[in-house]
Amino acid sequence: MKIYKDIITGDEMFSDTYKMKLVDEVIYEVTGRLVTRAQGDIQIEGFNPSAEEADEGTDSAVESGVDIVLNHRLVETYAFGDKKSYTLYLKDYMKKLVAKLEEKAPDQVEVFKTNMNKVMKDILGRFKELQFFTGESMDCDGMVAMMEYRDFDGTQIPIMMFFKHGLEEEKF
């Protein structure tokens, strides 16, 4: 299994257990699912509660959301009230990524710059439909992932988007 981490903050963003698609060599689109699960739900294999005592069932907290967000402890951020503030963040973040690329993969700099401009125009056109998420550290200097719901055969499916060049792969 591969874990994809933010190269700036080290936060875990997602893993390869989800359906992934690379768009224009710069954006990973990761398909999520809406889930509901009990917090702290522990199931012990082979455990058989005593038949003599009535089960006093406890109220357990339930969490609902997109599996990628819950499993990797992503945090929704409301830092971008408008397209202008998000564009300012992107310009700053892209400079950081170009600096990292020049260090580690100079051959990728031109691919990144060319394709990123195209992809960002498309994303900015859908700005109002997007939700934004940081890693667990909630550090906006790192990657801010995007999520939108897309219609597939009448069903709304959450799709998260991550910048390929802002991630490092870690094998488990």
From Swiss-Prot:
It comes from the Eukaryota. Residues 1-172 form the TCTP domain. Signal peptide: none annotated. The keyword Cytoplasm applies. Keywords: Calcium, Cytoplasm. This is Translationally-controlled tumor protein homolog. Involved in calcium binding and microtubule stabilization. One of its GO terms (molecular function) is calcium ion binding. It is found in: Cytoplasm. GO terms for cellular component: cytoplasm.
